[in-house]
Amino acid sequence: MIVCAAVRLHIDKTNEDVILCGPRHHYIYKQLEGLGFEPNKGYSRVMDGFVTNTGKFLNRTDGLVYAIQVGQVNANIRDEFTKGIKVELYSEDLW
């Protein structure tokens, strides 16, 4: 089960990758501001995605496949995926 939106970031100062979580991706960027980061300074965004209840990070594409497999999205989303219309998951698709 996907439990939160997530962003994988590379922090320049520590040369480490971190994953920040929140209910929606834009809240995560607000967290960065709260931590003193200016937009796109001191870090690079590696990837937007989601975290599962087991702590696994999934990118938007893998997140969509996973959410369909576990029944976490509605029939409209599944149909759009099957038709090739939808290829990425957004938090609005989940909650």
Predicted features by range, described:
Residues 1-48, 52-95:
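Linear-motif-rich, low-complexity cytosolic tails and juxtamembrane regions
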